[in-house]
């Protein structure tokens, strides 16, 4: 539980327990592979405040002193996604034009933030349409889509997204150049697909949540502001890659690969997109994987097998290098008058990956190996490795 007070000195309470375990506050089999198939959440609070939880509100029983809120989740839900939020909330009702039709949305915010939130959360309409374009229908319309102001930064609580970013447009630094995009709303909503609809089988596979969540940010920037801006964002994220340990490590050992799961995970997906060199196939994989494994528990190997089946190619060596080993491949290259020399070093035996380069702004696709190869280029040409 997060126990805080709002600016008016009133109770402002939430729950965020990913990593620590939901069994801290309610009885469950606390493992990523275990999910209740539905959930009744009944909370009694003083009548001068409100409780918001996952799912839809079925009943409110009010007396002069106490009020009981009865929420119900109709779909399977991760243990750590079950949450309650208690505060002096105002409710903003909205509608979202989904691929499934016009759907209701609710935003629960501290009463003194109602006006700013009403304007700020208009972005959710564009965001939802964009994410449904990439991944298919929002999985939880049956339980609703809510943004709930919380006393902590944010969390992907299913059908009740926790929001605590103070209505900022991105957070700070380089992200502020994107203007109107709130990364908490975006990233946590992305987890409704990557994390909640499809759930990692173990903490070791958490990149399936966070890498896809981060790359969703990239895709949304691309959708709203264009591809060059999304590359700029990716380049900034690359600065945070550490490569100190494998993204996916041993399972059943409480190995959470959070360190590189976000930034490197996003870059791995972008690299895969480049290797495929066909956006129709790449985005078909994203949407198809969501449909094929909807409301299921998956491991990284399930994703690799799915990609192999769709493409007819073997991408296991690609993921062995980038996901199961901490060392990225190194491309060594040099220029000498009219020659470009290039090769890979530090790669696993079966690894193979093309590289796109610009030679005087003309795109050339190379297939490096551990043996030095030569490309003849115009004298004193400008060569740029493409991102």
Give, region by region, the residue ranges found by the protein language model.
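Extracytoplasmic/secreted proteins, especially bacterial periplasmic and envelope-associated proteins
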Residues: 40, 119-126, 130, 158, ...
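Acidic/histidine-enriched alpha-helical segments
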Residues: 2-3, 143-152, 207, 211, ...
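Juxtacatalytic substrate-recognition/specificity segment
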Residues: 41, 70, 90-192, 196-205, ...
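Amphipathic alpha-helical substructures
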Residues: 139, 258-340
């Amino acid at each position: 539980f997060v126990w805080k007070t709002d600016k008016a000195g009133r109770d402002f309470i939430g729950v965020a327990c990913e990593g620590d375990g939901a069994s801290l506050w309610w009885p469950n089999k606390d493992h990523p592979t275990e999910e209740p198939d539905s959930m009744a959440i009944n909370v009694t609070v003083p009548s001068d405040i409100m409780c918001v939880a996952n799912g839809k509100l079925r009943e409110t029983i009010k007396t002069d002193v106490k009020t009981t809120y009865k929420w119900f989740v109709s779909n399977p839900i991760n243990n750590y996604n079950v949450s309650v939020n208690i505060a002096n909330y105002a409710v903003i009702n909205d509608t979202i034009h989904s691929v499934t039709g016009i759907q209701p949305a609710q935003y629960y915010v501290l009463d003194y933030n109602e006006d700013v939130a009403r304007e700020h959360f208009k972005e959710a309409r564009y965001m939802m349409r964009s994410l449904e374009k990439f991944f298919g229908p929002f999985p939880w319309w049956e339980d609703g889509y809510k943004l709930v102001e919380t006393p902590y930064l944010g969390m992907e609580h299913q059908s009740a997204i926790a929001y605590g970013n103070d209505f900022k447009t991105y957070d700070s630094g380089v992200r502020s150049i994107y203007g109107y995009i709130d990364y908490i709303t975006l990233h946590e909503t992305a987890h409704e697909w990557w994390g909640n609809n499809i759930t990692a089988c173990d903490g070791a596979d958490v990149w399936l949540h966070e890498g896809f969540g981060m790359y969703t940010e990239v895709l949304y920037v691309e959708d709203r502001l264009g591809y060059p801006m999304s590359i700029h964002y990716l380049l900034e994220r690359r600065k945070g890659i550490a490569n100190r340990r494998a993204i996916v490590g041993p399972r059943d050992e409480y190995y959470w690969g959070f360190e590189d799961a976000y930034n490197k995970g996003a870059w791995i997906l972008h690299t895969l997109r480049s290797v495929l060199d066909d956006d129709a196939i790449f985005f078909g994989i994203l949407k198809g994987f969501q449909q094929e494994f909807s409301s299921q528990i998956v491991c990284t190997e399930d994703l690799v097998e799915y990609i192999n089946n769709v493409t007819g190619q073997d991408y296991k060596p690609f993921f062995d290098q980038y996901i199961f080993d901490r060392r990225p491949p190194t491309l060594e290259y040099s220029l000498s008058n009219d020659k470009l020399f290039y090769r890979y070093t530090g790669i696993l035996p079966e690894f193979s990956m093309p590289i796109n380069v610009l030679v005087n702004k003309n795109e050339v696709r190379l297939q490096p190996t551990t043996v030095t190869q030569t490309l003849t280029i115009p004298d004193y040409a400008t060569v740029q490795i493409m991102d």
